[in-house]
Amino acid sequence: MRRGTSEYEAAQEAMAEILLERARSGDWPIQYGKLSNLLEEQGHNVPAHSVEMDHLLADVSHQESPDGTKTTLSVMVVLKEKGEPGAGFYRLAREEFGRKGDNVGIWGEEMKLLAGDFRHR
């Protein structure tokens, strides 16, 4: 699956719908494996720990917050073993969304933004 293809765009739309619904309902966090399974149920093969998963999470985050003022939706997706986001989330938050601080601080602030952005929806 490559960026810019109809297959990729369909997977991105499906991921956005899954994450937005979970954000609105407060049903987060979600593990990478669970997100992968939900996408698979809709016909999208996106392995949990793959480049495609990283790219889709980044693109969905940019889609929902193009100017970086809202939360990165990828904050809800966590590693089963640690219960926190993977390295790709922190890289995205720092390099593309301009977030500052250590991992714990960035994660905490993004979770607050998530709660604030979706509290009244």
Residue ranges and their predicted role:
Residues 1-15, 22-121:
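Nucleic acid-binding interface residues in structured DNA/RNA-binding domains
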